Amino acid sequence: MERYQQLFKQLAAKKEGAFVPFVQLGDPSPAMSLNIIDTLIAAGADALELGIPFSDPLADGPTIQNAALRAFAAGVTPAICFEILAEIRQKHPTIPIGLLMYANLVFHNGIDHFYQRCAEVGVDSVLIADVPFEESAPFRAAALRHGIAPIFICPPNADDDLLREIASHGRGYTYLLSRAGVTGAENHGQLPLNHLVDKLREYNAAPALQGFGISEPAQVKASLAAGAAGAISGSAIVKIIEKNVAQPVEMLVQLTRFVTEMKAATRS
């Protein structure tokens, strides 16, 4: 959890926002996945948001569903994902690592065991996409027992009670949802979200990172202008992977270009 606090402190001192890329672990293969993640970090990623491939991803659009299918085709399992995570942490000791998950994968070997594994490999936060806040108590408790930040989604229509609860129980960062629906670069994020960011700040919530539909530098600037501490981009990155599976060198060149441009937009 401290890695997020350190990151936001350093960025505030530099007057920068955070740019956080999302990819599926093991896409298109475990070895290439590590290459991709090294490339994202070298290009300027401030933190990582990583998915463990799941067979029935309700919140994901087709781009991220296809990434899971590619990982499955390469034989990726949750156990292999944890091996990849351990390797990332060993190479990159300071970058915050977040997981974006589905509850079935957390339940699989028991909630406590899951968070224990996260702590062992150096994961900082876990967001469970299909667990609403009202049902999150057992996950929150296990997360905090193991020093993992529980991340909550703040939807665009959140009422005051929910904002207070998220502020009170969330750690690390707050996932500010641009809009309802599924992920996808085609579905542009809807702003402004200033009122939500203001309320979250008033209630001392963890810094807000805006996600869903963030695919170009102008949207990163808009997120920061609305008061968010940064932006998360997934589908746009996974699309670059999808289009270049057969040309890994070109893939890494394009990923570097994309992340460099998105990170540049966080500098005021």
Curated annotation (Swiss-Prot):
EC number(s) per entry: 4.2.1.20
Gene Ontology CC entries for this record: cytosol
Catalyzed reactions per annotation: (1S,2R)-1-C-(indol-3-yl)glycerol 3-phosphate + L-serine = D-glyceraldehyde 3-phosphate + L-tryptophan + H2O
Annotated metabolic or biological route of this protein: Amino-acid biosynthesis; L-tryptophan biosynthesis; L-tryptophan from chorismate: step 5/5
Family matches, as Pfam families: Trp_syntA
Enzyme class: lyase
Highest taxon listed in the record's lineage: Bacteria
GO MF annotation list: tryptophan synthase activity
UniProt-listed PROSITE patterns: TRP_SYNTHASE_ALPHA
Entry keywords, A to Z: Amino-acid biosynthesis, Aromatic amino acid biosynthesis, Lyase, Tryptophan biosynthesis
Active-site annotation: E49 (proton acceptor), D60 (proton acceptor)
Family: Belongs to the TrpA family.
General function of this protein: The alpha subunit is responsible for the aldol cleavage of indoleglycerol phosphate to indole and glyceraldehyde 3-phosphate.
Record text on subunit structure and interactions: Tetramer of two alpha and two beta chains.
HAMAP family: Trp_synth_alpha
NCBIfam families: trpA
Name of protein: Tryptophan synthase alpha chain
Organism for this UniProt entry: Yersinia pseudotuberculosis serotype O:1b (strain IP 31758)
Primary gene name: trpA
